[in-house]
Each structure stands twice: as structure tokens, then as C-alpha cells.
From Swiss-Prot:
NCBIfam families membership: metK (TIGR01034)
Cysteine pairings via disulfide bonds: C34-C60
Complexes and interactors: Homotetramer (MAT-I); dimer of dimers. Homodimer (MAT-III).
Record-listed E.C. numbers: 2.5.1.6
Swiss-Prot/TrEMBL cofactor(s): Mg(2+); K(+)
Effect on the protein upon substituting R264H: In MATD; dominant mutation
Impact reported for R264C: In MATD; has virtually no enzymatic activity
Family to which the UniProt record says this protein belongs: Belongs to the AdoMet synthase family.
Protein name: S-adenosylmethionine synthase isoform type-1
Gene name per UniProt: MAT1A
GO biological process, one term: S-adenosylmethionine biosynthetic process
Modifications after synthesis and translation: S-nitrosylation of Cys-120 inactivates the enzyme.
Amino acid sequence: MNGPVDGLCDHSLSEGVFMFTSESVGEGHPDKICDQISDAVLDAHLKQDPNAKVACETVCKTGMVLLCGEITSMAMVDYQRVVRDTIKHIGYDDSAKGFDFKTCNVLVALEQQSPDIAQCVHLDRNEEDVGAGDQGLMFGYATDETEECMPLTIILAHKLNARMADLRRSGLLPWLRPDSKTQVTVQYMQDNGAVIPVRIHTIVISVQHNEDITLEEMRRALKEQVIRAVVPAKYLDEDTVYHLQPSGRFVIGGPQGDAGVTGRKIIVDTYGGWGAHGGGAFSGKDYTKVDRSAAYAARWVAKSLVKAGLCRRVLVQVSYAIGVAEPLSISIFTYGTSQKTERELLDVVHKNFDLRPGVIVRDLDLKKPIYQKTACYGHFGRSEFPWEVPRKLVF
């Protein structure tokens, strides 16, 4: 079932055909544990104080979680409970799994937000004129290759991890443990700048498991109950390569296997390597941190342009300076898939979107405690989030 050792890399593709790979990780991956804890802390503050200013980083290793960062808030938050509840939900509830919410040590090193930042960003300002919390550049991407306007590679990689979590929680595959990684390689055809998925070339799944399961049993279950339940049959063929549990053994996982840190899965969180990334992570940050809010807004713009039929594929870049409300620049790249010029599309964006942080927070309702849900399986391509509801454009 597993492919050859060399990975069967195919260099004989036709003109206009290429392969692209994206990966995702499950809830129990150590970096994702940290993302979820950071966003659980953010949500806990926003539930009591929608104006809380939060920048919360998390580190985890065997038997230990460290919270560090800067928070200014009226909320009274029990950090021990927030951390332990999050780990329990993820599924690390027994030391036999390498991590246990009941016995892990929780260290807290949180301070107030710097007054230098506060005075230039939000103090004595109308909400609409709140300044960006830092400088930076952010990207939004959309493509018509899927209904979600997301790359098929990352959509499937997320769904494979989510399916394993469902099978674990339901008890259908009781040998599964929370840490997992997936990777999907799709063969694409170029179509005048747009991309069309043709077939799946390779699927990789590595998932933590208990001791009393054989490798063959795991591989069979992953193919029959995970892949076939998630991946449309039209993309699979006799040449699709499967690397299922390629290490052969993955009993030690989660924070015991690797240290975790918030913000180390920024490509998993966004477009799986498609488009571009400005480098800023999302989790643990309130809306004044444009790393997060402006990336959500840029995705909203990109998806709205594609759904309006103005282009088939688009990359939107925005940039900011600390304390300045208006974006410094907005750029549109359509890969040649639009009947309009990029200047005309920029006019459409200016007429329909206000990308000041204080307006983004209102339009996308970013003071609500919705963030822990975003912290696994991707921030984009999921209809429950406001930035995934395309705006009806006037043009």
C-alpha cells in the first residue's frame, strides 16, 4: 500500500501540467495545541471584555505549558482552567498518551500591553480610527478550483485530519491519538492563469497511535475509513501513491515528541503554500493586530472578487504602519484571469471595502469570542466565519 522509498517523484509531466503539495496538522500536534490554547485565552478575555488587548503566546513540552505575552483587559480569567480545558478537549487526558491535562504544569508569564503601543494605537481614538497595532504586510488568496475558493490541496489535507479526530472521538478507531499530520499532492492543469485539479498524485498520513495496533491494520483503516470518506473518488486512480504511517511507528507524539510554540504553522493556517504569506501568525491576537484582522479582510476581498466573477484566481496584498489606520498600500494580482485590469479591480476594492482595522472589526464582527474554532483545520474556507461570506460588490 505504501509507495516506494524514493517517493515516486514524477518528472515526466506534460506542458501546462504541474504538481503542488500542501500539508495540515491535527489538534494534538504540539504547535497546534499552542495555537488553540492561545486562542482559548483570547476568547476567555473577549467573553468578558470585548475590548481586551491580547497578545498571548504558548509553549508546550512534556508535562508543561507556558503562557507568555501582553494582555490589557478588564476580564478575570482563570488561566489554569482555560489551559487544562483546552488540552482535555484536544484529547490528552492520560499520561499513557504522553500528556495529561490533569497533571501538566501551567506557568503564566503575562504582562500588560506596552503603554507606548496603547497610546499610538487605540487610546483617545474613535473606534473607526484605531491604528494598526504594528507594521506589516498581509495577503489574501482565492481560487475558483473549489466551492470554498480554496486550493484543493489544503482543503483535503485539513479534512483528512478532521476525519481522524471524528473517528477518534466517536470510538470507531480507538487506537488513534490526537497528534497527526497529513500531506496532499495534486496534479494540476493550467488554464490561462487559473488552475484545475486533475488528480491526486500522493497522500501522506502520519498519526499517533496506541501500542496494540499493527501497522497493516492502521494502513487499511486510514485508506478505507479516512481517505475514502474524505477524498472524492474522481481524484483517485490506480497510480495514486499512499504513504500511510511511513515511519512505521508513532506512539510518542504531541508535546512529548516535540516542543510546541504558537504561530509555527502559518502556512497550514492559510493557503498551504499557495498565494503568499507576510510572515505574521494569527493565534492569540486581538483585532488590533493586523497580522490577523487584515489577513482575514484580505481573504474576504479576494473571495468576494472571485465569487463576483471578476477573476478566477487572485492574490491581495495590504500593508500597514503602527498607529496608522489607513493601509499604506493595497495591491491586486489576478494571474491573468480577469477581463478587468488590476487598476480597475483596485477601484472596485476601494469602492466596496474599508480596510482600516477599526472598520474591519465592525464588518467582520471580530470582537466575538470565535477564535478557538479557527485555531485548527485552517482559518479560511470554512463557511461559519464572517470573512468567508463574500460581499456583494458594487462595480
